[in-house]
Amino acid sequence: MKTVTISKERLRIHIEQLGEIGKTKDKGVQRLALSKEDREATLLVSEWMREAGLTVTHDHFGNLIGRKEGETPSLPSVMIGSHIDSVRNGGKFDGVIGVLAGIEIVHAISEANVVHEHSIEVVAFCEEEGSRFNDGLFGSRGMVGKVKPEDLQKVDDNNVTRYEALKTFGFGIDPDFTHQSIREIGDIKHYFEMHIEQGPYLEKNNYPIGIVSGIAGPSWFKVRLVGEAGHAGTVPMSLRKDPLVGAAEVIKEVETLCMNDPNAPTVGTVGRIAAFPGGSNIIPESVEFTLDIRDIELERRNKIIEKIEEKIKLVSNTRGLEYQIEKNMAAVPVKCSENLINSLKQSCKELEIDAPIIVSGAGHDAMFLAEITEIGMVFVRCRNGISHSPKEWAEIDDILTGTKVLYESIIKHI
């Protein structure tokens, strides 16, 4: 086997340079999917892919794909992926380290002239976060045939549809031809992804990385409660139809339901809430808020969602409100491949790295790729477990460790 060097310095520089695109005033990152910042980042990452020896294309779901052909191109490819879009005012490591690790692995393989039978693909999936169209994991869902026509009609805060955003993004993307970009079982041999943990376990227990055994399935909703607007000073409390108070009742119930079983990893979050018309002296006419419910057990998650829906109906009936529940996305919890878990464990053993087996509470592109191939994931510890924040931070030495482990496993499968 030829000696291969993973460049810590190149990884560090790439992370820093990409972090400058969409940089916010408090040193966070805001690169919403299919935005001008996303386009600028795509151009830069495409350049790095080419430097690593990858041929760059886009599919019609907006996924950026770099491919290095193997000796037998007809064989299924080995894919490494993640995302480069961000949440609003997020951090510079989330998703990014997975894409850049993939590029660095191919860079090292190219520099050492390593011969491989299977082609290697590095993918930056479109809109993993869902922060623009409130509908995440779009690119990976599309790749496995799970995007519906109505998903293309989702609108952002400026009433721009995803279809329009894709159509004008460039790079040959045409949402009228998404059917041409669907992969089938047998097209991809294995899928690997590296990501920051986005939680405190690894740091608390002094592990640089962890091996993921499974991914909790998120379910996203948008709830709208409609009441009756009125003057804040003249409508008695007993006669009000205030949807914001109703929303508060529902939100408190979300917390209660998700904490009922102290041994369960169930989590529920209301991340966005807006009252209309939004005047300080006006009783709101309507309120919209998002719901994010996650669990590693599908049945338990679905039961909690049923109870939340019952609470919404009860509150609405009691307070004289109308309600709408829009289901935006639901992902089934998935387990990582035992084959790839064992491969990653063996790589850790060879490199003398102690890595625990952990569950991912966050959703990742890997969970949809699992529908057509085996998946393997590596987590990198992050400071204080913070993510989706300008305070998000991962040490370059830990990122390097994860990249080396990923390389040692991938090289055995190509």
UniProtKB/Swiss-Prot annotation:
It comes from the Bacteria. One of its GO terms (molecular function) is N-carbamoyl-L-amino-acid hydrolase activity. The keyword Glycoprotein does not apply. Transmembrane segments: none annotated. The record marks R240 as: Necessary for dimerization. Its EC number is 3.5.1.87. InterPro entries: Amidase_Cbmase, Bact_exopeptidase_dim_dom, Peptidase_M20, Peptidase_M20_dimer. Keywords: Amino-acid biosynthesis, Cobalt, Hydrolase, Iron, Manganese, Metal-binding, Nickel, Plasmid. Requires divalent metal cations for activity. Binds 2 divalent metal cations per subunit. GO terms for biological process: amino acid biosynthetic process. Its cofactor is Mn(2+); Ni(2+); Co(2+); Fe(2+). Residues 214-333 are annotated as: Involved in dimerization. Belongs to the peptidase M20 family. This is N-carbamoyl-L-amino-acid amidohydrolase. It comes from Pseudomonas sp. (strain NS671).
